[in-house]
């Protein structure tokens, strides 16, 4: 990773981080703030790091949420290119794509709902007890209600799987 990051810096090109290609204890989310200090823009290939076969479809997991929080906390929504992985040999590709994109959108929404200004203030005050308390409280914040409202306002059905199955039966089955 260090070679590729150094090379992109040397050549003045946008670095790409693929969170599916790091050691299991190494997190891309930990690298974002440092990369943003030295790069005008960065690119992320968000995937699910499964270290066998396929099944890389992005889900609303801890690392995806942490990546989104780093982007939002660094006020870098306009500086980070986000791509998702939807390769999976065992499930419908359309469903995998929609699920992955929605998971990233949910993670960004979750990050945008965090009380970042309050957390920064507490950090500056060395009030780590309240930081921990607030972070724990936010884990159960009603993101589902906000997500449902977002889908409704965008006129997007919450249940995309019905449409995917219909497409699968009417279109995809004819391709076999």
Predicted feature descriptions by range:
Residues 1:
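Basic- and aromatic-lined ligand-binding clefts that recognize polyanionic substrates
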């Amino acid at each position: 990773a260090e070679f590729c990051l150094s090379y992109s810096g040397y050549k003045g090109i946008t670095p790409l981080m693929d969170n599916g290609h790091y050691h299991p204890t190494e997190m891309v989310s930990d690298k974002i703030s440092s990369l943003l200090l030295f790069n005008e823009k960065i690119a992320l290939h968000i995937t699910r790091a499964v270290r066998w076969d396929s099944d890389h479809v992005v889900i609303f997991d801890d690392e995806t949420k942490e990546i989104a929080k780093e982007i939002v906390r660094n006020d870098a929504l306009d500086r980070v290119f986000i791509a998702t992985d939807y390769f999976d040999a065992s499930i419908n590709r359309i469903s995998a794509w929609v699920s992955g994109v929605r998971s990233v959108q949910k993670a960004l929404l979750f990050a945008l709902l965090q009380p970042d200004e309050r957390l920064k203030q507490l950090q500056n005050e060395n009030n780590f007890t309240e930081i921990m308390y607030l972070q724990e409280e936010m884990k159960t914040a009603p993101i589902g209600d906000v997500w449902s409202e977002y889908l409704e306002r965008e006129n997007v059905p919450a249940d995309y799987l019905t449409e995917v199955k219909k497409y699968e039966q009417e279109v995809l089955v004819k391709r076999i």
